[in-house]
Amino acid sequence: MQICLMDETGATDGALSVLAARWGLEHDEDNPMALVLTPQHLELRKRDEPKLGGIFVDFVGGAMAHRRKFGGGRGEAVAKAVGIKGDYLPDVVDATAGLGRDAFVLASVGCRVRMLERNPVVAALLDDGLTRGYADADIGPWLQQRLQLIHASSLTALTDITPRPQVVYLDPMFPHRQKSALVKKEMRVFQSLVGPDLDADGLLEPARQLATKRVVVKRPDYAPPLADVATPNAIVTKGHRFDIYAGTPLTE
């Protein structure tokens, strides 16, 4: 994949070349998207809209730390949707990891989560965030146990992941109507990079075959159900729906 690669660390250790080789990235000087190694983190920028700033994954500070400390925890809609109850903390595959926010919420309340991400740039951002998270004295010990990244296409990976998870979580990219600054900024940068998930409808059936308990699909409230498969089971929040489908139980 081609993208503009930039190193702002001032170091001469070749870290950017190593990163490019690992994720299969080729430097393209004229690409409007840039992956930038800063002294603090790896970030994605839209070069023709510099005011949008950089997007990076941060599990340790910022909004994620606030959500972990002061958010609803088990009361969050995503936690309810995957079925967390009492001692039951399902094993989850997040097949559309993105920036890892929902996966992190589930991990922070005790679930083991395997994140799938097919876009190499997004996977590199996630990996960078995980590396910093794993090294953090506060969250590192449990984050290493509960949150993992698999760089693979969900369409193929969903058929051969073992062991099978109890829950598969899907949050395909869907054009956002909201005008909130954060969503607008992130979506503009993100959609410039990856575009909409045109093949997302193809994820529902393999997800249902893989999950032993349920599949949860996050949708904007105005979006049709994934693959036009309606379900009476949903958790509705302001602006979103978590549609719930039955999985395929383990056979003895």
Curated annotation (Swiss-Prot):
Keywords: Cytoplasm, Methyltransferase, rRNA processing, S-adenosyl-L-methionine, Transferase
Predominant location category: cytoplasm
Gene Ontology CC terms: cytoplasm
Chain residues that bind S-adenosyl-L-methionine: 101-102, 117-118, 153-154, 171
Subcellular location per the Swiss-Prot or TrEMBL entry: Cytoplasm
Cross-referenced InterPro entries: 16SrRNA_methylTrfase_J, SAM-dependent_MTases_sf
Catalytic reaction equation(s): guanosine(1516) in 16S rRNA + S-adenosyl-L-methionine = N(2)-methylguanosine(1516) in 16S rRNA + S-adenosyl-L-homocysteine + H(+)
EC number(s) reported in the record: 2.1.1.242
Cited CDD domains: AdoMet_MTases
Class in the EC hierarchy, top level: transferase
GO molecular function, one term: rRNA (guanine-N2-)-methyltransferase activity
Function statement: Specifically methylates the guanosine in position 1516 of 16S rRNA.
Family, per entry: Belongs to the methyltransferase superfamily. RsmJ family.
Cross-referenced PANTHER family: RIBOSOMAL RNA SMALL SUBUNIT METHYLTRANSFERASE J
Annotated protein name in UniProt: Ribosomal RNA small subunit methyltransferase J
